Amino acid sequence: MAQLDQHICFLLDVATRRITKFYNRRLRPFGITYNHLFILTCLWEQDGVHVKDLAHQLCLDSSSLTGHLDRLERSALVVRQDDPDDRRAIRVVLTAKGRDLKDQLEPIGQELKATLQRGVPPERIQAFTAALRNISNRLE
């Protein structure tokens, strides 16, 4: 019998699926997904980002991001606007509705963070985060 729990890729996949399920269950009442939350989080930190910069931040190709932005735009959470300084560039801007969601959605992320970190010393969390970043960077 395969010892899948010894394979880092399997464990990462299981964790990712469980985290996605956690988020999507809690985000469903707001009409958004886990990926949409990442987009909104980036915009809450820096509104008016160029589409290509947002795609880079999120490690998404432009066609995947476009689909997510289409849905967020239909939900009136963001709008895409031409950049007045560069006619070839498009900026993604939060609407008032998108900005207002922040206070409702941030506790969901805080709940998951508390669950994941419960009983784990901060230095282990930092080491784990560094290891994940290292793995991700090696696969770029």
Question: Can you say where each PLM-predicted feature lies in the sequence?
Answer:
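Residues within helix-turn-helix
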Residues: 51-52, 63, 70, 90
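Charged, amphipathic alpha-helical coiled-coil/dimerization segments
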Residues: 20, 70-130
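Key DNA-contact positions within bacterial/archaeal DNA-binding proteins
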Residues: 35-37, 63
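Pre-recognition alpha-helix immediately N-terminal to the DNA-recognition helix
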Residues: 18, 22, 38-41, 100
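N-terminal leader segment of winged-helix/HTH proteins
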Residues: 1-30
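Short, locally clustered residues in the helix-turn-helix/winged-helix DNA-binding domain
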Residues: 13-16, 41-45, 106
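The alpha-helix within a helix-turn-helix
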Residues: 55
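Short capping segments at the starts of secondary-structure elements
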Residues: 46-50
